[in-house]
Design a protein with these regions (language model features):
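Short beta-strand/loop segments at the ligand-binding rim of alpha/beta enzyme cores
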Residues: 1
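Nucleotide-sugar donor-binding catalytic core of glycosyltransferases
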Residues: 4-172
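C-terminal "capping" alpha-helix adjacent to the active site of nucleotide-linked donor transferases
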Residues: 175-189
């Protein structure tokens, strides 16, 4: 969108009865342009698109998502270096990764719609990375993965841990080393 779009968007925020934002951080952004009555509207999943399928766990560990230059390639490289089987779906963005040469063997084309849900169902473990550019503390994928009853392995945030308590509903990591350790443990049990 161009500058005119944002100028009009900001005007509308000031006269709207209610403004919904994606994350708590955005409340201050909206207040900064004069918006009132701001509420967080969490992302969710769509039941007809995200559901448990009767299929085998044929993919040990996967990340289904875009590349962002926030260090996620270091996590994937750490898994590869530790000989932990990992697949990344959504290939083209990942060519921009600083560590692309070391991780390209595990990168596959993206999955959409029915294939996306089916692929998550085939995973024993589905990884969640959070956008640092957007200051995410959760993402829509955090709701889609549990809908399939696939184990969710995610970067830790307080928000996620409140929604999905650690080691009950999800498993969390704070470093590449911890991620590798948890993946090895989970795959062996």
């Amino acid at each position: 969108p161009n500058l005119g779009f944002y100028r009009n968007f900001h005007k509308i925020l000031r006269i709207s009865d209610v403004n919904y934002v994606y994350r708590k951080k955005n409340i201050a952004d909206y207040e900064g342009v004069g918006a009132k009555n701001i509420k967080v509207l969490l992302p969710y999943y769509i039941e007809r698109n995200n559901f448990k399928e009767d299929c085998k766990d044929t993919i040990p560990i996967a990340f289904l998502g875009h590349f962002e230059n926030d260090g996620r390639d270091k996590y994937i490289k750490a898994l590869i270096d530790a000989k932990v089987p990992v697949t990344v779906y959504n290939g083209s963005d990942w060519e921009k990764a600083p560590l692309y040469e070391g991780i390209k063997s595990c990168i596959k084309p993206g999955k959409r719609e029915k294939e996306y849900n089916h692929t998550i169902n085939e995973c024993k473990i589905a990884i969640v990375f959070l956008s640092k550019l957007n200051s995410d503390t959760y993402t829509r994928r955090c709701f889609e993965i549990p809908a399939t009853q696939t184990l969710m392995l995610s970067e830790y945030t307080d928000d996620l841990n409140r929604m999905f308590p650690a080691d009950e509903c999800a498993v969390y990591f704070k470093s590449p080393e911890e991620m590798v350790e948890k993946c090895k443990y989970l795959l062996s049990h």
